[in-house]
């Protein structure tokens, strides 16, 4: 009985921690997509695309980094590869100039958050 209660408590704690991480990623993806949309006057469909793209980026980064004892250099490589993949994905929907403008807008909002 005691083991069952401990297991249930452990599952709940893991669930809450996972939700907290997902909420952070959702908040960032929302912030980035909303800011870029207002700055560049993008459509709601474009905003949804940006949101989905950034959320996928953040989730993938977390999976590659979280819980692993990586050096700063290894993390930088993951972030760089993630950025390159993001640019490729954005280029499937937007032209190069629009992609650069989106990246600049996101950098601007990211710098404001610091």
Regions flagged by a language model, labelled:
Residues 1-25:
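Bacterial Sec-dependent N-terminal signal peptides
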Residues 21-114:
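Charge-rich (acidic/polar
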